[in-house]
């Protein structure tokens, strides 16, 4: 046995040393296979031969610019501008790669010989001879073809097969291959062509006028054009000469003449129009007709060449919806027509529309211009004294760095020489991380003198302006204005400053002042400003009488007080509301009371917008007498209704539901409408020129919902008719090949100008020869639509709802009583069921078909219910008792049965709530069961802009029943359902894991041949559905269409790369998509989205957790778990399994590459190699540069490989590097701060936020410095410390500004991969002598005790000497069902960033707690300018402020500073829980709280490099805080635990045992595995590569709990 163990160990060591030949051979084989795979992948790329002779640098440029190709460089042909010429072939191939192979392509100005050699018979080259060079170039191409053919003939070869078709075409029909007309006049007509047409323009777009380009493309029916051209951003400056260095070319500009040439070559120049090229660069839209435009989009920039594409856009696809309420209906519809035409004009015909109006777009497409500004340079002639000016591009950061610094110069120091000296120094100085560096600004040194003069002139003018501004303010006796402010101050008391500031900000008052005469010129112009030429003008500040505004403000203040009870009152725009109340003469107080009543739904009326905006509330409350003619009336009044038959006789049918110019009470049941045929030939204006909804709905909520439903039908009908009229008006410019949702029939020719996708439309819109438009009932014969003589055209729509909307409106108007809907008294029960709970099955089991009625939204669902009900062979379900909702409403009253006992509505929540109320009323039932799912897709308002308020969407019911057991969904989907539903969702399915996802390379990958999809195919959008159907997939539906359906297997596909709003974590569409299958679902997507994250989370679930959701006969047994474990953590003992390899695997997955770093000799390498250090002022004792040799005991060697470093040896170099990276590398970010006043305000906020109200004032009767406090401090000290105080007489203090410096021997491990690229500096310790600590230690211990006793411990935790159990108790009352934002503030260089302001804040906190003034001043001076001495390393230096890491206040001081920092930036009054420890913080806020720009505030006020993170789980002091529905559990970071197992400082076995015990103490919570799944989520949130880690957590528990087993993690270093 011993021999076997010895042999195993020896083999293992041989493998580690690389002596195992088998392992070495396997590694070589793996390396060889990888290399072969990589070369094979490269061989599959398109091959391009580069024959021109170019340099190695140019070879690298070409290779990097075009990674899509495998380029072979032959270097066999010398030529002029060889790189540019060779790149031209690459550019051509790149453009052709964008085009589908075989599609007809026009090459504008192209090389037809290149296409012949590639065998592209589908390309037509347009090669006009604009000058003699073009003729010469074309002849050269013909010569290359003849040379190629003669070479084949001489060798007895024939043209290869792939070229044969192209050469035959060129030989037989040369005009099909190439023509010599311009692209605008080209008349090439393809013989037979199907599919889309494309075009490319390689360096030829310059010669086509931009205004003619769109029309030329449309004449050739081009779908997309790809173009490439040379350009430089510098052409947009005032430069007349611009170099293109990479291709050795240049642009020269003279007015509008732009010349392109190659440097140092005698080739001819190319001349173009600068303004024409600028249009191609800056414009977005290129009009082609009054309907279509070509929209430009930049693709990429490669080697001074810009690539872009022009896409054909049909502006008729812009949707025109009708859902607005106007005072004058005729004016509204006229204005709507004008607005739509104006919108179309903007999209097509505005030739000055500029793409780069957005600065973010400028930065993206002009990357060299990002953060660059254009600065003027000035010069003067000595002979003529004439001043000259030019412009250069300079980094904006560089400009403000210089200006901010030289602005601090005193008047005498502000000289040109000093400015130039500073500019030259920051351009040349080298600093990186305090050690080595180079300048971050690459400014041309030849420009430094001119730039310095510009900076100097600007600063001198700015200083003069400031002096004049200050002189304008009176500093003597009080002015009249000041006396007014004093009187206001007396009235408001202490609140005056904030009131004054509020009034100034609101512009209700203004401060008078004289106009200033000095204007400092703009220092720079941004690149974006130069493009769009935007300028702003200054406005003087006039005087203003504030008395009237103060009275108005008082009125608005009272109104604001009334509005303060609203949830979002802070978002109400008071200025807009005030203006509207004033113009309409509405009392603001009355308006405020109405707003509160409407928002709380207690008023009995509803405004038809989503929330009452300021203007609409004032308009709704306008006095009736002041209203204009035709304005809506809130109160009901009797109005005589016009005759319906008379309206139809005139062709003007009134069909405005409950809307229009009449109140709802004026409508009554009208027996005149007997048939829908009476609507035939009603004018379209009568349908689309009526108001679509009332401003105010009155009555109970059900009545309001029913009124809104009628108005929604009117709006839908109006929108459909309006769109058909628009199609008839714009038919002339419609492209016949474009797929449309409409159809237009030309009556004279009996042909469809636009062929509809469907047939036999019942209704349409007719255009007569008199250009009048009517709604018509269509009839058909054997020739098609039956038409009349005066008809010109007929428009139909595949999505038209004219017939159904008219029929439903006819039915609902009959049901109105005196203009009001009748509400049934039947009991309404909502059955809320999870997906797959068997809602349809339950309906069939409960229904009595002889007396009950079933209604469903869709025809397929109705047929499915009839089929299932009649499956036994007995026909019980017929079209009389199982109907669709539309059929029931349209045919109401025609059936033999008109009354039912019970009504069952399946998927009722997909209907408008008013529709449901009407169905209950129309069925005359006693009880109605509405089956639905509150979390799935609700009713969607399809009419754009139609108001459907949020409280209308909630169905009013008498009782709610829940169904929480799914018969369909597998266990993993059931786990997801538990997040979305209240209560416990269980499943009867035996399938545990069913979901998966696959990221595809692009939409083109999805096709039936290479990617057959299994099961039912679903998409989220109609566009994706149409794309899949067009590619050959069958039976494809959207998620919305299959709600309520069940399938065994589902393939869910997303082809749209742009963001889709319905794909979100809480989207009902995602819920429906995940719950349609019983066995499997696979999600194919082209982008990462929230659904991918959800599926990945479900894939990581462990099987034992999924077993908890399985139930056989109900949910009662599962529901008992909550009452048993409420208020305490569920405990499940962790199994002790796993091996060392599990820990190593987990560490390598989380931190890849760290374990491979051989860092044992990093410290030796640093001491033996040359090093350059940038050191601040300090004194070095070079005699300490060589450390004395010490006998080192070899530590134990860990078996787990981590990034842990070997212990470092103290020495001059090591300590100096640590001091440079720590103490000398403090950031300087803060702005100008009034330290004392700001510190006082911050401390006020600190006390108000964290301390109990009754303990905010210190107890002055308690002495801080007493014998008891000294004894408490001594009890915590070691005997060695007490011995150092034996000779201290406590009469006088040692120097409090003298500190000692040392380093920790063991570097701190970082849980990232930075160890692979940098040498980690040691942590420094700066500390006082024990004599000083003996004075201040007891004091601050007592102050700390008082502070912690005063903190509101129910909401805040100051983590000092707390156990993990206490942390769990503190966070244990968090309600996991309440949405929360978990915030963490991450601050880098926390200790070293603290400056005078931090010292003032901390001192003010201790002072208010009772710190004695004299000792407080001593303590403050001891932390101001301090001297550091490192006797071991021989270093002495001076630093200002900074947190001393070995000070008595290090920990508590850091804690109160982080708490004060957060209190000054975040709304602590809203916080749920907060914890602070040193520089760590963890905050829980209610979901949706608005937070300021924390990074900005932390930089300017606190000098912190801070980032605020929102998390799902908290991370605090190396522990994950997992809150759940029963409390909270705190897990020690498992990755940090594994990192410690790789420690290389363990001396011996006794030390190892102490190490194990300490790890056991901190990791005790890992013994509970009940919440390992949540721990996985928390770890993955920090480390995105972390796999599910339950296996490694169990392994850690196994080794930590066994003393003997733990020793196997290390081997004795002395035996190696």
UniProtKB/Swiss-Prot annotation:
GO molecular function, one term: RNA-directed RNA polymerase activity
Residues where ATP binds: 833-840
Catalyzed chemical reaction(s): RNA(n) + a ribonucleoside 5'-triphosphate = RNA(n+1) + diphosphate; ATP + H2O = ADP + phosphate + H(+)
Domain (+)RNA virus helicase ATP-binding: 801-963
Cysteine-cysteine disulfides: none
Domain RdRp catalytic: 1380-1493
GO terms (BP aspect): DNA-templated transcription; mRNA modification; RNA processing; symbiont-mediated suppression of host innate immune response; viral RNA genome replication
Keywords: ATP-binding, Helicase, Host-virus interaction, Hydrolase, Inhibition of host innate immune response by virus, Nucleotide-binding, Nucleotidyltransferase, RNA suppression of termination, RNA-directed RNA polymerase, Suppressor of RNA silencing, Transferase, Viral immunoevasion, Viral RNA replication
Transmembrane segments: none
Enzyme Commission number(s) of this protein: 2.1.1.-, 2.7.7.-, 2.7.7.48, 3.6.4.13
Region (Helicase): 830-1085
InterPro entries, sorted: (+)RNA_virus_helicase_core_dom, Alphavirus-like_MT_dom, DNA/RNA_pol_sf, P-loop_NTPase, RNA-dep_RNA_pol_alsuvir, RNA-dir_pol_PSvirus, ToMV_Hel_N, Virgaviridae_RdRp
Stretches the record annotates as Methyltransferase: 50-458
Domain Alphavirus-like MT: 72-281
Residue stretches making up the (+)RNA virus helicase C-terminal domain: 964-1116
Protein family (similarity comment): Belongs to the ssRNA positive-strand viruses RNA-directed RNA polymerase family.
Record protein name field: Replicase large subunit
